[in-house]
Amino acid sequence: MKNIVRTFFAAALLLSGLHVYAQPQAGDNQRLTPQVMARLFPAGVVSPEYNADGSVTFRCQAPQAQKVSLDCQMLPAETPMTKGENGVWSITVTPGKPDIYPYAFVVDGTKIADPNNMFIFPNEGFKYSLADVRGAEPSVQDIQNVPHGKVSYRFYHSETCGIDRVMTVYTPAGYDPAGSEKLPVLYLIHGMTDTYETWFKVGHMNNILDNLIAQGKAKRMIVVMPYANPYPEMIRQGKAQMYNAMDTDLVTKEILNEVKPFIEANYKVKTDAASRAVAGFSLGGRQALACGLGNPKDFKWVCAMAPAIFGNEYEANFQSGVYAPVGSLNKNLKLLWIGTGTSDFLIEASRSLDGYLTANGVKHTFYTPDGGHTWMNCRDYLARIVQLLFK
């Protein structure tokens, strides 16, 4: 029996991809002693390492590499790392402020995620890791000692797209699917090449909601995070669908015809328009404007974070029916909120939209913090809008 157990354990190690650097010696095979464990599981590279002075050390083991650099949003540009013992390259950086920073290593021109960091940025186009730099006091995006909600993965079939799909759904602490409490719903859309996990794993939306609900600053709500890019799966399955990331029509149909009915059939939610909000970042902000402004009978709260609109195309959207007539917005909406950082490449288009809305007498909020087209700003946007919704 012992031989069977040892054989099974050895097979498991091989299948898991772990490297056995030394064979157990005579007498060691009766139990997993510290010596055996040290040989089977050698100490790895620690990266990132958060230092007491607030700095962060990044390490990448690449003994054959000629050049390794750090690409990180806490730095203005890609920065060379220094090669040390055992082929481990390193660099220590002091961020300007506590936050969650995406980063990657550039090894001889090839960009890779940190293999020693389990926290990955979910994205279709790039693979970055996440450095979570904490401050002396917890921020709204940090896990705090408050009641915690739950994030669930929900799978469904989409008749609109003709494929099986997935979304993530946040329910607040104490949500009871068999109870009498019905909650409002925020439909929260990610940016281009992001996924249904990005608002959760990068945006930390669950921590933000948990903390603000516990503080009484945000209403209890359900947050639905759909996968707003169905094209890759549709193309793989041979669907006759032209890829057009800027097209908002398919996403609007998916949310209205598939996602919203699924949520209202499977969760205890309010079903009036005043209890529904739609928000999104970047391409998701563009999609939120089309979905919300184009369907005021379904959404009374519309929030666009650095929306991917260009020039004055919003005027054509109002005139063509993509959006409801501009003169109807004050009557139909409870909130129209737009936020874009002052160094965001989309700031001028947002300023143009703000000017157009102001000139047409549309009540709205235009928020312009420092910063660019980043998820650091996204977390700030979300923390602000959820304190306004459903009040």
What spans do the regions from the language model cover?
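Bacterial Sec-dependent N-terminal signal peptides
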Residues: M1-A26
